[in-house]
């Protein structure tokens, strides 16, 4: 039996993790979400109210909510601790998702606001999360912390494939990767594995309501994707992504070189 804490558990990959992991009644899953009532309702309706799922309020932009979530989690898991802390929650900015960074220059206020929100949520929020939950992780058997990152934070991928879009979001994920590496350096001697993982392209509805102008931006990006990964057929269903990601984090270890690493869903640098 393993204990999992998953942030951003209300939808997308986060809810996919909750659904998949809780299928084994021996596992215990704690999901951190901003809207506790709505997520509890979703769990009851879609997962039959599985008793091995606990939903807690936890907002990456609120230190106090994360502190309370850690305290509540400690009461739930007891001496077992947290085997897997999955830092999945994030702010996926749309502001920079379709255009090059230079095209944002005239939108000064929004650029500053979005950048601040990205850093507070995707970077500082996870620093707080790790600091607050590390005592529980150290109590466990598995001792694994997985940060869900993005290929947009990989410098080689950006430079080698001329990836222009998602500049601010990518910068926040690159910063998260550095944070994870720093935590790894600190806690590796105590047997805690920290690493970052990009889930690849997953069908979670990010592009359901794009405008014609945004489609134009995506077309250029998709052309580069086809050149980078000719085998790529499009975003995969959440269920498939979760299966691949879980297989990677299960085999990941300090001994096999994952400590502080930034890898794809496959455990390498092939992002798609």
From Swiss-Prot:
Database matches in Pfam families:
adh_short
Kindly identify the residues recorded as the active site. 150, 169, 173
Function statement: Short-chain dehydrogenase/reductase; part of the gene cluster that mediates the biosynthesis of iso-A82775C, a enylepoxycyclohexane and biosynthetic precursor of the chloropestolide anticancer natural products. Within the cluster, the prenyltransferase iacE prenylates siccayne to generate pestalodiol E, using dimethylallyl diphosphate (DMAPP) as cosubstrate. The probable oxidoreductase iacF is then involved in the epoxidation of pestalodiol F to pestalodiol F, which is further converted to pestalofone A by the short-chain dehydrogenase/reductase iacG.
Q: What happens when the gene is disrupted?
A: Abolishes the production of iso-A82775C, but accumulates pestalofone A.
List, in alphabetical order, the Gene Ontology terms for molecular function in this entry: oxidoreductase activity, acting on the CH-OH group of donors, NAD or NADP as acceptor
Give the protein name, as stated in the record.
Short-chain dehydrogenase/reductase iacC
| Pathway listed | Secondary metabolite biosynthesis
Recorded name of the encoding gene: iacC
């Amino acid at each position: 039996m393993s204990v999992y804490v998953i942030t951003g558990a209300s939808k997308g990959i986060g809810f996919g993790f909750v659904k998949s992991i809780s299928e084994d009644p021996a596992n215990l899953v704690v999901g951190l979400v901003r809207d506790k009532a709505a997520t509890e309702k979703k769990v009851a309706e879609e997962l039959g109210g599985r008793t091995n799922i606990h939903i807690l309020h936890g907002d990456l932009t609120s230190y106090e909510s994360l502190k309370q979530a850690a305290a509540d989690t400690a009461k739930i898991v007891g001496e077992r601790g947290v085997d897997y802390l999955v830092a999945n929650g994030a702010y996926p900015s749309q502001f920079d998702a379709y255009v090059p960074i230079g095209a944002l220059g005239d939108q000064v206020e929004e650029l500053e606001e979005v950048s601040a929100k990205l850093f507070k949520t995707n970077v500082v929020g996870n620093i707080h999360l790790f600091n607050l939950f590390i005592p529980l992780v150290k109590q466990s058997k598995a001792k694994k912390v997985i940060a869900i990152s993005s290929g947009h934070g990989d410098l080689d991928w950006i430079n080698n494939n001329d990836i222009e879009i998602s500049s601010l979001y990518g910068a926040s994920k690159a910063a998260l990767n550095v944070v994870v590496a720093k935590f790894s350096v600190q806690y590796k001697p105590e047997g805690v594995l920290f690493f970052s993982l990009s889930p690849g392209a997953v069908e979670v509805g990010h592009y359901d309501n794009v405008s014609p102008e945004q489609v134009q931006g995506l077309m250029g990006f998709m052309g580069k994707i086809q050149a980078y990964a000719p085998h790529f057929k499009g975003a995969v269903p959440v269920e498939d992504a979760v299966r691949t990601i879980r297989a990677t984090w299960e085999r990941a270890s300090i001994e096999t070189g994952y400590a502080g690493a930034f890898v794809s869903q496959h455990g390498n640098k092939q992002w798609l």
